[in-house]
C-alpha cells in the first residue's frame, strides 16, 4: 500500500479512529483492502443509520452490487442459507441468498426500496418471513473474529459498526471509476478528498483490532 498517499489521512491509528468517529455520526468510510488481495476500495455505511441519499450514492458511484454485511447469528435468525453450497470464490466471499423486504417495497431495486429491505433485515426480532428471496440486496456473512479472522470488507464493515456502537451490520459497495474499471488506491484517495470520507485500510483495522485484544 502506498503509505505516502494515505499519510494525508493520518497515521494508521488516527485513520481508524477517524473512521470510527465517522461511523458514530452515521457517515461513510472508504476501506481499502490489501494490494495482493482484491486491491479495491469499498464505500461503507453503518446499516443501522443508512439513508436513501447514502444508498443513492452507493448505487451511483459503485458497482451496483450493494451488500449487507451481517453476523452469522443474524444469518441464522433470518434463515439465510449460503448462495451456493460449494463456494469456489478465491476470497471465499460468503454471499447468502439475496433478499427483499416482504412488504413496503415496489420492484425492490430503487434506493428507497433497498434501504427498506436493510431496515427490515436488521430490525430487532426480525423473522425469516419478513423477507422475500431472491431480491436486490445481497447479504454477506461475516466471519466470527472480524478482520483478525478474515481480512475482508465484510468483516471490516461489521467491526467498524460494532466499534462505533451500532448494530454489527454495514452496507458496502465497491467504488468504480467513470469508465467502469475498479477504483484503486489513488482513485479512492481522490474520492475520499472530494466527498470528505475518511480512508482506512484493512491492515489499519487489523492492527487496531489486535491492539484491542492484547
From Swiss-Prot:
Its EC number is 4.1.99.12. Mg(2+) 2 binds at residues 38, 153. One of its GO terms (biological process) is riboflavin biosynthetic process. It holds the Pfam family DHBP_synthase. It is an enzyme of class 4 (lyase). Mg(2+) 1 binds at residue 38. Pathway: Cofactor biosynthesis; riboflavin biosynthesis; 2-hydroxy-3-oxobutyl phosphate from D-ribulose 5-phosphate: step 1/1. Catalyzes the conversion of D-ribulose 5-phosphate to formate and 3,4-dihydroxy-2-butanone 4-phosphate. It catalyses: D-ribulose 5-phosphate = (2S)-2-hydroxy-3-oxobutyl phosphate + formate + H(+). Belongs to the DHBP synthase family. Keywords: Lyase, Magnesium, Manganese, Metal-binding, Riboflavin biosynthesis. D-ribulose 5-phosphate binds at residues 37-38, 42, 150-154, 174. This is 3,4-dihydroxy-2-butanone 4-phosphate synthase. Disulfide bonds: none annotated. The record marks 136, 174 as: Essential for catalytic activity. GO terms for molecular function: 3,4-dihydroxy-2-butanone-4-phosphate synthase activity; magnesium ion binding; manganese ion binding. Binds 2 divalent metal cations per subunit. Magnesium or manganese. The lineage of its organism: Bacteria, Pseudomonadati, Pseudomonadota, Gammaproteobacteria, Pasteurellales. Homodimer. Signal peptide: none annotated. NCBIfam families: ribB (TIGR00506).
Amino acid at each position: 500500500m502506498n503509505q505516502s498517499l494515505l499519510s494525508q489521512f493520518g497515521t494508521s491509528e488516527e485513520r481508524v479512529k477517524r473512521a470510527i468517529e465517522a461511523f458514530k455520526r452515521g457517515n461513510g468510510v472508504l476501506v481499502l483492502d490489501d494490494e495482493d488481495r482484491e486491491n479495491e476500495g469499498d464505500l461503507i455505511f453503518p446499516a443501522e443509520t443508512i439513508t436513501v441519499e447514502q444508498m443513492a450514492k452507493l448505487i451511483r458511484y459503485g458497482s451496483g452490487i450493494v451488500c449487507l454485511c451481517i453476523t452469522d447469528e443474524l444469518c441464522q435468525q433470518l434463515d439465510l442459507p449460503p448462495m451456493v453450497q460449494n463456494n469456489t470464490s478465491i476470497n471465499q466471499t460468503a454471499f447468502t441468498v439475496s433478499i427483499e423486504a416482504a412488504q413496503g417495497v415496489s420492484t425492490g431495486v430503487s434506493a428507497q426500496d433497498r434501504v427498506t429491505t436493510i431496515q427490515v433485515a436488521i430490525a430487532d426480532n426480525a423473522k425469516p418471513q419478513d423477507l422475500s428471496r431472491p431480491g436486490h440486496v445481497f447479504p454477506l456473512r461475516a466471519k466470527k473474529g472480524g478482520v483478525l479472522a478474515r481480512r475482508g470488507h465484510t468483516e471490516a464493515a461489521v467491526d467498524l459498526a460494532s466499534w462505533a456502537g451500532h448494530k454489527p451490520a454495514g452496507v458496502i459497495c465497491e467504488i468504480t471509476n467513470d469508465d467502469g474499471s475498479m477504483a484503486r488506491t489513488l482513485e479512492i484517495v481522490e474520492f475520499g478528498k472530494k466527498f470528505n470520507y475518511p480512508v482506512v485500510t484493512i491492515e489499519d483495522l487489523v492492527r487496531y483490532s489486535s491492539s484491542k485484544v492484547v
